[in-house]
Amino acid sequence: MSTLKVVSSKLAAEIDKELMGPQIGFTLQQLMELAGFSVAQAVCRQFPLRGKTETEKGKHVFVIAGPGNNGGDGLVCARHLKLFGYNPVVFYPKRSERTEFYKQLVHQLNFFKVPVLSQDEGNWLEYLKPEKTLCIVDAIFGFSFKPPMREPFKGIVEELCKVQNIIPIVSVDVPTGWDVDKGPISQPSINPAVLVSLTVPKPCSSHIRENQTTHYVGGRFIPRDFANKFGFEPFGYESTDQILKL
């Protein structure tokens, strides 16, 4: 059987729909928790604290969360990073009103004393300085993004593009400004230092700079027969790892 290493946006949506359908029964909250946990593990793998000075350990992981599910992954990621000993700060400029669940994610961040900045707080630009920030997590838009990019996110991404060569950016599933199938079609668009594909890589991942972007897959929640049904082989995660470097 021929296998695919990537799935289109249409197929990715079908996978999510079936996982959350009545026969399998995953909830969005469960999948988001596992996805955000895997992104946090990728940050830990790529930017380990072991052996770092106290000054380096004190740097922030700046998580920028969009209004949809990609942003929810970022909120979950920030909570786990706090538990892993990192110093996350979340910028959540346009909060989701879809369900109570997103509000609960913010309440959890407050419980763990993770700062959550709003659009009105102009000091978010202070976290785009390499002396203050270890890395930036781009959890703005995912595989459902369609251009044009609107404010406030257009301005935010323009600022990220100015610093992406001095502060590494970790993109969740699809780099913001990229079409999930065609790659970077929107200006501005991010060129991440790390890409964490969720469940299975999307076609846009073929456009990453192989010598400059580290690629992980995460979201370890599907068995072999389910993967084969959608035309790909499951990934060879080791032991209890939630991510695999590709």
Curated annotation (Swiss-Prot):
> Which amino acids does the record list as binding K(+)?
70, 138, 176
Q: Does the keyword Aminoacyl-tRNA synthetase apply?
A: no
- Essential cofactor(s): K(+)
Q: What Enzyme Commission number(s) appear in the record?
A: 5.1.99.6
InterPro entries on file: YjeF_N_dom (IPR004443), YjeF_N_dom_sf (IPR036652), YJEFN_prot_NAXE-like (IPR032976)
Q: In the UniProt record, does the keyword Nucleotide-binding occur? A: yes
Give the GO biological process terms: nicotinamide nucleotide metabolic process
Residues annotated to bind (6S)-NADPHX: 69-73, 142-148, 173
Q: Ranges for the YjeF N-terminal domain?
A: 12-234
**What is a GO molecular function of this protein?**
nucleotide binding
Name a GO CC annotation attached to this entry.
cytoplasm
Provide the alphabetized UniProt keywords: Cytoplasm, Isomerase, Metal-binding, Mitochondrion, NAD, NADP, Nucleotide-binding, Potassium
Subcellular compartments: Cytoplasm; Mitochondrion
Record family assignment: Belongs to the NnrE/AIBP family.
Q: What else is known?
A: Present with 1380 molecules/cell in log phase SD medium.
Q: What is this protein called?
A: NAD(P)H-hydrate epimerase
> What is the protein's species of origin?
Saccharomyces cerevisiae (strain ATCC 204508 / S288c) (Baker's yeast)
